[in-house]
Amino acid sequence: MAEINLTAAFSTVPAAEGEALKQMLVDTIEQLAQEERKFSRAKVVFTESDERCGLTAELDGVKKEGIPLQLDLDLMEDAKTNSGARAQLKEEIRLYFRRVQGEAQ
């Protein structure tokens, strides 16, 4: 199982909802680690401010992508209960992680 260190900061999301979003992100990143088998440690920072979300990551000490992944808060909220939205979010994070590791898209 991958070691995931997620730091999250929310400005407009209530605390309970923020914790649910944080857990959903951790679960998604763990799934990607198991599926891709390309990293064992992930340091991830997620920020939400005025409903704008950004995610940055360092995977096994590698961070070749300096631009944060912009995520849609509505998509993230839908991903908690909707498998289609969850799959879309997971794919966005998967592609971002490949850029972080320096892989071509």
Task: Describe these PLM feature segments.
Residues M1-V44, N82-G84:
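Negatively charged, low-complexity tracts enriched in Asp/Glu with abundant Ser/Thr
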Residues A87-Q105:
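C-terminal low-complexity, charged extensions that often adopt amphipathic alpha-helices
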Residues A2-V13, G54-E91:
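Intrinsically disordered, low-complexity regulatory segments enriched in Ser/Thr/Pro
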Residues K43-E58:
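Short, structured protein-protein interaction patches enriched in aromatics and acidic/basic residues
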